[in-house]
Amino acid sequence: GGLPLQVPDAVSDQQALWHYYQQWQPEWQPGTMRNYSNASIGLFGLLAVKNSGLSFADYLQKKVLQPLKMTHTYIDVPAAAQKNYAWGYYNGKPMRVSGGMLDAEAYGVKTSAQDMAKYLQANIDPDSTPALKQAILTSQARYLRVGNWYQGLGWEIYHWPVDAKEVIAASDNGVALKPHAVEVLMPAAKTDAQSWVHKTGSTNGFGSYIAFVPQQKVGIVMLANKRYPNPARVEAAHKIITALAKH
C-alpha cells in the first residue's frame, strides 16, 4: 500500500505507533504494488504475536529459537554474551544496531553463523523440525508475482535454476526499494523445492544474506560487520551455491 521504509522518527511509543497506522492512508490500492517497507514487515510481526500475550522477543524465543536450539540468538544481547557481540563499522567508525519502534520485529535479531546454519537447515528441510514445519512452508509459499520472481513471507523466491544476473539486478537498492506492480496469486502457490529462496539484511554497520535451494539441499549464510552492496552478496552466494549443487 505504500508504507515507508522505516517507521517515522516522531513515532516513539506504542500509543503513537497505533495512531500512526490508524491514520495512515495507502498510496495504492491493496494488492497492486509491492514496496519494500520495514514499517510493513514490523507491523506483520507485531500482529502475528498479538493474541499470544507475549512480546515479540519472548514469542520468538519460545516458538522459534528454542525448537531450533538457536542458543546464541537474541533481540537484546545479554551481559554474558557481550564479549561475543561484534562491532559493526560504518565510515570506519565502530557502531551497533540502534533501537527504534519495531526494531525487534523488522531487523533487530543478533545471531551467530552457527545458529543461522540451524535456521538454514530447517528452511531447506522443514521435515527436520516438525514443530515449525507448517510455519516454514507457509513462509515459503508464493503470494505475489513481481516480474520474474515471487514474494513469500519475507522471502524473495525465484524458480531454480536462475540466472545470477536477474537476482543481482533485482537486489540492488536502486531497484529493490522502488515500487513494482504485482500480480496477487489466489490462492497462494505452495512451496516449491525447485526454488532459489533468499533475503538480504542491512543496518548501517552490518550486512547479511541468506540464500538456499531446497531441491539441491544447499544454502549459504553470510554475516559481515560492514554494510556492503547487496549485488556483491548475491553474486558470491550464487557462485558458491551453483558450485555446490554440481556435487
Annotate each predicted stretch with a short phrase:
Residues 4-8, 29-33, 45-50, 104-107, ...:
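Second-shell loop/turn segments in exported
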Residues 3-14, 71-73, 211-213, 220-221:
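A short, well-structured edge-of-sheet supersecondary motif
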Residues 49-54, 58-62, 66, 96-247:
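Catalytic loop of the DD-peptidase/beta-lactamase superfamily, centered on the K-T-G motif
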Residues 1-38, 54, 62, 79-100, ...:
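Active-site-proximal loop and beta-strand segments within enzyme catalytic domains
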Residues 18-26, 45, 49, 121:
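Amphipathic, well-packed alpha-helical segments that form the structural scaffold of globular domains
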Residues 26-40, 104-107, 209, 217:
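Short active-site loop at a secondary-structure junction
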Residues 40-45, 117:
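Well-ordered alpha-helical segments within folded domains of soluble proteins
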